[in-house]
């Protein structure tokens, strides 16, 4: 891993991340937002974490299979997530932003803060050090946090999964998922300039409209105003 330089915030490309518990509907909402952005003639890239690039996808498979628990627990998982993020940011996200694309990412460092930090008991010093090495001062332009009651989210995830075995995180006890929801709500409250908390316990189209309003007010309209004044 190498030290990252800050992303040039004046680029037309924007970085939007989606966070939330299991079954919150992140994948669906990313797809719907991508369609709207493309309709607005904005080049869009959809990706995910862990994963998104070939190296990160290989690490994803190991993580979801539970390798972190086998080789050292939460600290080991945090290191693996950092390695995946380093590859993902360096080979996919940064080049896309440099091309002026809008990048929509299913999970980013807030998930590490929630899963491995608050709930996995990884020290804040370690997480901050890993974040500085992997992304430096880079931050999403907007983080959409989808909030849904835990029982409803897990039921949705079970329907989506079908007969497949629950992954490493889906199989955690319900108290884990309740704690996860609370951590994401805390992040939204602590960083309102970056985060928007969206009630995801509604029809997908209604949730998509709420997200679009946030994107329009926070990113699209300021960008257009800046272009006119330039």
From Swiss-Prot:
The record's top EC class is transferase
Q: Which family does it belong to?
A: Belongs to the thymidylate kinase family.
- Could you tell me which NCBIfam families the record lists for this protein? DTMP_kinase
Q: Name one GO cellular component term.
A: cytosol
Q: Which ranges does the record mark as transmembrane?
A: none
GO term, biological process aspect, one: dTTP biosynthetic process
Domain of life per record: Bacteria
Q: Which UniProt keywords apply?
A: ATP-binding, Kinase, Nucleotide biosynthesis, Nucleotide-binding, Transferase
What InterPro entries does UniProt report for this protein, alphabetically?
P-loop_NTPase, Thymidylate_kin-like_dom, Thymidylate_kin_CS, Thymidylate_kinase
Q: Which Pfam families does the record cross-reference, listed alphabetically? A: Thymidylate_kin
The organism named in the record is Rhodopseudomonas palustris (strain ATCC BAA-98 / CGA009)
**What does the record give as the function of this protein?**
Phosphorylation of dTMP to form dTDP in both de novo and salvage pathways of dTTP synthesis.
CDD domains from the UniProt entry: TMPK
Documented EC number(s): 2.7.4.9
Q: Which reaction does it catalyse?
A: dTMP + ATP = dTDP + ADP
Which amino acid positions bind ATP, per UniProt? 20-27
What is the name of the protein in this document? Thymidylate kinase
User: Which PROSITE patterns does the UniProt record give?
Assistant: THYMIDYLATE_KINASE (PS01331)
- What Gene Ontology molecular function terms does this protein carry? ATP binding; dTMP kinase activity
